[in-house]
Amino acid sequence: RLPSEAEWAWGARASGSELLKFPWGDAFPPPANSLENYADNTSAYVTGRVLGGYTDGHVVSAPVGSFKANQNRLLDMGGNVAEWVHDVYSIPSANGATEVDPLGGQSGDNYVIRGASWSHSKIAELRLSYRDYGQAGRDDVGFRLARYAE
């Protein structure tokens, strides 16, 4: 099964009792040794925009496991390809309240896509809270499988 959006967000952002802003911490831009796959100098001719001064060595997606795991031992949560999750896309609440284990929209035409990919370089796109939506596949979107704990 695909993870829910809440499961994906926990796996990407949870670091003890803290929620990370970016895979590397709270400061921007990423350090040179961040080792996540974003729109860097090597992909400039493909993406048209890059994260200046950053090079991860991959023009587009990298093989899984090319970069070290995050604090929860999960690979590629902050870059490489963005990921489909199970939830139907709905616009977040305007009051800014944090939802606890939200179930997402009950119906709709678009599904949630979480995380940054090799084609992203803007500060908002690199945040672990970044979310997108879509119906059709893209060359910078993939998926991961989740299973129920026994």
Q: Which role does the model predict for each range below?
A:
Residues 139-150:
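Short, structured beta-strand segments at or near domain termini in extracellular proteins/domains
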